Amino acid sequence: MKEMYAQLGISSEVYDFGHKIEESLKERFEKFDKTAEYNQMKVLLAMQKNKVSAECFGSSSGYGYDDIGRETLEKVYADTFHTEACLVRPQITCGTHALAIALFGNLRPGDELLAPAGKPYDTLEEVIGIRPSKGSLAEYGVSYRQVELLEDGTFDYNSIRKAINEKTRLVEIQRSKGYQTRPSFSVKQIGELISFVKSIKPDVICMVDNCYGEFVDTIEPSDVGADMIVGSLIKNPGGGLAPIGGYIAGTKECVENASYRMTCPGLGSEVGATLGVNRSFFQGFFLAPMVTKGALKGAVFAANIYEKLGFPVIPDSTEPRQDFIQAVSLGTPEGLIAFCKGIQAAAPVDSYVDPEPWDMPGYDSQVIMAAGAFVQGSSIELSADGPMKPPYAVYFQGGLTWEHAKLGVLMSLQKMVDKGLVTL
C-alpha cells in the first residue's frame, strides 16, 4: 500500500505518521459506520415503501406535469426525513436559493424573521436585507432580528425570550457553523431550542438550515419539531452524484407555501421538468449515508493529524461531529497556501492546477480555494479554502470516499513538510 501512495507523492514518513493516527481512530470510525448503516436502512425503507422502479428514472420536459420520478423522489425524501411533504428540484440551484425560497414563501410584509444563533451565512445577508440588496426580504417589509450566542457557544435563552414578539413569524436556525468559529449544533440542541420557542409562541415556524448536516446523525431536525428543513443536493443528500438541486422538507403548509415561491401562485409543485436528473437524484440519495460517512472520517482524521502537530482545530479531535467541516488555524500564509495546494494535488479533476490567493468578490481579503470536483461547488467532494488573513484558517471538507479524503489530508501534510513548515 505504501508503494501506491509513494506513486502519488506521499513520502514514507508522512504515510507512517498518518497510519498511526488512523489506527488510533478505529473505535471512532466504527461509530460512524453504525450511523451510516442505520441511515442506509432508513433510505432503503423509504425507497421500498414508495415502490421506486426503473420508470422513475425517466425524463420530463416542458411543464413537467405528472413526472412520476419527481413525485416518487419527493415522497422518498419526506419519508426519510419524517415530514409531511418535500420539494426536491433541479430548479433549486443551491442551498442559499433553497433557503430563500423557503423564507419568501412563508413570510409576509409585517412579519419578523428571528435568527437565534447570531448572523447566518454571508450569502443570506442580501436575501434578508442585512446588507442592502434589490429584492431582499427587507425590501418587502419583513423585519429581521438576531440574538447572539453566549460566550460558550450555546443559545441565550433569556435574550431569545425577549426577542420573540407578536411580529415573530419564522425562526431560522443554522445547524452547521459553516465558516464561523462557533460550534455546530446537535439535533438534540436544536430540538430543545424549538421546544423553547414554541412554548412562547406556538405558531412560529421553526426552519432549520440543514446544510452539511444530513445523515451525520440517525435523526434530523424534522424529528425534533422543525417545521421545515432545507438543504442542497450538491452537499450530503446528493451523494456526489446530483449535478444540481436543493430540497425543502416539512409540514404540508410550509412546503406548499414554498412551492408557490419556487414557481408561481397557482402552479406550485405541479410543474418543474426534471430533464434527465432523476436517476442521479435517486442514486445519490441512496449513497448519501455512505458518502457522508467518508467525509466525516476525513474531517476527524484531519483534526487529529493537525492537532497532533500543534495546530488549533475546530472542532477539536475528540468533539462529537455535527457536520464534516474541519477548520485548522495554520498560522501563516505559507501554511494555508501549502495545505490548499496539497488538496488540489489530490483531486481527480484539475489535479495539475496550482491554486493561488485571489481577490474574491465579497471578501475583505484575498481567498485561496482548492477543489478538483466533478460538480462545480460541490461541498461533499474534497475541497479546502480560506481567507488570507490571521489566523490563516483553512476550512477542509468533503471526500466522496474515506480513502480519497485520507489522501487529501496526507497530501496537504506532505506539501507542508516539503516547505519545511512542519516536522514529523
Give the role of each language-model region:
Residues 28-32:
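Short N-terminal edge-element motif at the start of the domain
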Residues 307-424:
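Conserved C-terminal alpha-helix-loop-beta "cap" of PLP-dependent enzymes
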Residues 2-22, 26, 43-49, 53-56, ...:
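Conserved PLP-enzyme active-site core in the AAT-like
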Residues 60, 80-83:
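Flexible linker/loop signature enriched in Pro/Ser/Thr and Pro/Gly
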Residues 36-40:
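Acidic, PIN/NYN-like endoribonuclease modules and their adjacent C-terminal/linker elements
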Residues 84-87, 111-114, 169-170, 203-206, ...:
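Structural motif
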